[in-house]
């Protein structure tokens, strides 16, 4: 009658602080109407865990399976779950409605104990649903909704963006551009802000024409990239928010006879296999994607087995890996 999952009912009975007051009232009203009484003895004797964690991916299937970040994070989650004798299952779809239906089906049937969301986006209806239903979830990425009640694992992407830009500055670059993912993704917005912070610190004016954003890092982004390279005063270095996008940049540079790193230095993020497979190999910020997954799984299982733990946030450190795509300004 309350239209919520069995785990939400269980957590309401235990007065879990992660369940909203509105949801608690809805569940308790339905319990009264049904004449339901909690059997605390049975609850203590019998585990209600399914020992399964749902992993929620973004709606774009192509981008997910081409992006090493998601694959490494899933590898970390699976590795830790196996150690703790939990299972994990992937939830995705062609669009948000399809993902929501899958989440509803899994949670109401008691097939999962909680969800790890592998991305963080502003005004996300999936997060709205998870929170309103009192479902246990953890974000990989910074929480922008229900921040005080949300568990999340993240990098300090502001600092990472600043560090990448500072590295180029120390090589003598002053005409530094930014090429990134859509800023509705919180990691991309923070990396861009970090880039701007580094410019401001050194008194370098921010040039809007030196910034380009793309909706799909694995799509055809030739136009956006060319707009940066064909400026009246072209940049001597570019901070790129993702290794995959940096590979596209290298390809367009090759087509336009722009030499890397002699004409253009490139620094990117994720330190994926792609960064090591290009020529020249990419200097990249390692965000420790697998460790993000491990930490998310660890926190999830801790909160499943100890429901009254308060929401926490964990920051996983990043590391700059120097390779061949950057040099001192000529």
Where do the protein language model's features map onto the residues?
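Bacterial carbohydrate/catabolite-sensing allosteric modules
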Residues: 33, 76-85, 131-139, 144-330
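Short acidic/polar active-site loop segments enriched in Thr and Asp
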Residues: 5, 51, 113, 174-175, ...
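N-terminal helix-turn-helix DNA-binding module of bacterial transcription factors
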Residues: 1-51, 327-330
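Amphipathic helical "hinge" segments at domain boundaries
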Residues: 36-101
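Short, electropositive alpha-helical surface patch
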Residues: 102-114, 192, 196
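Short beta->alpha connector loops
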Residues: 36, 94-97, 118-123, 244
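Short, well-ordered alpha-helical microsegments
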Residues: 100, 123-127, 246-249
């Amino acid at each position: 009658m309350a239209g919520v999952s069995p785990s939400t009912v269980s957590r309401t009975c235990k007065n879990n602080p992660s369940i909203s007051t509105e949801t608690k009232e809805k569940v308790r009203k339905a319990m009264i109407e049904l004449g339901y009484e909690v059997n605390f003895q049975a609850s203590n004797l019998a585990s209600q865990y399914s020992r399964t964690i749902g992993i929620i991916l973004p709606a774009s299937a192509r981008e997910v399976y081409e992006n090493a970040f998601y694959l490494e994070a899933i590898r970390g989650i699976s590795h830790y779950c196996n150690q703790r004798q939990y299972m994990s299952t992937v939830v995705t779809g062609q669009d948000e409605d399809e993902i929501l239906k899958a989440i509803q089906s899994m949670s109401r049937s008691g097939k999962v104990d909680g969800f790890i969301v592998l991305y963080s986006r502003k005004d996300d209806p999936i997060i709205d649903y998870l929170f309103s239903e009192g479902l246990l979830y953890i974000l990989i990425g910074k929480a922008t909704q229900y921040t005080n009640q949300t568990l999340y694992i993240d990098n300090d992407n502001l600092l990472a963006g600043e560090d990448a830009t500072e590295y180029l500055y120390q090589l003598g670059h002053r005409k530094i551009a930014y090429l990134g993912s859509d800023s509705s993704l919180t990691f991309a917005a923070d990396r861009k802000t970090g880039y701007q912070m580094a410019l401001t610190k050194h008194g370098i004016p921010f040039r809007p024409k030196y910034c380009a954003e793309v909706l799909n890092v694995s799509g055809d982004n030739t136009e956006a990239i060319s707009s940066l390279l064909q400026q009246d005063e072209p940049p001597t270095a570019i901070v790129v928010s993702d290794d995959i996008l940096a590979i596209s940049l290298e390809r367009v540079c090759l087509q336009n006879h722009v030499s890397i790193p002699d004409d253009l230095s490139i620094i990117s993020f994720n330190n994926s296999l792609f960064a090591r497979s290009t020529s020249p190999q990419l200097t990249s910020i390692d965000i420790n994607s697998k460790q993000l997954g491990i930490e998310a799984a660890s926190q999830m299982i801790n909160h499943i087995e100890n429901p009254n733990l308060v929401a926490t946030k964990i920051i996983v450190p990043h590391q700059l890996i120097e390779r061949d795509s950057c040099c001192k300004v000529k």
